[in-house]
A protein has these predicted regions:
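Conserved strand-to-helix beginnings and helix N-cap segments that scaffold or border functional pockets
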Residues: 8-12, 86, 127-128
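Pocket-forming structural segment of enzyme catalytic cores
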Residues: 17, 24, 32, 36-112, ...
Length: 137
């Protein structure tokens, strides 16, 4: 959706309520919402990515996806995670190869996952596979 995670305090409330109880998948603003609720700062990007396909690299921090592999992800966002971001439980698990912007997260202790890009987009290859891996985790 449009806006900044701080525009949606009730969503942050719901996230905190279900954090350790339910599997959570955040996509785009949901990804930003998770990071914001965990102390991350979400900022404006220099370039806006609406309807843009990026090459995204899977990092070694991922427990679900094969590290050093790449996917193509459909991006529709103007905000990003300000780094560095430190968390005891959340790892950034994918990055845009060109800009190094955080593109995915996995929580080590809770079943929380997120994508900055849109796995359901026609611009994303294997998006269905990404969601299926999370649902079966």
């Amino acid at each position: 959706g449009p806006g900044h995670p701080l525009d949606y305090p009730k969503t942050a409330e719901v996230y905190r309520k279900f954090k350790a109880k339910k599997k959570i998948i955040g996509i785009c603003l949901g990804f930003q919402q998770i990071l914001s609720a965990e102390g991350g700062n979400i900022i404006q990007q220099k370039k806006i990515y609406h309807g843009y396909q990026s090459v995204i690299e899977v990092l070694k921090t991922s427990r679900l996806f094969r590290s050093n592999s790449t996917i193509y992800g459909g991006r529709y966002h103007s905000l990003k995670l300000q780094e560095p971001f430190k968390s005891a439980t959340i790892d950034i698990t994918m990055r845009c190869k060109k800009t190094n912007v955080a593109m995915a997260l996995e929580d080590k202790t809770n079943h929380i996952y997120g994508f900055q890009f849109h796995p359901e987009s026609f611009l994303t290859n294997n998006g269905k596979h990404l969601i299926q891996k999370i649902l079966s985790a």
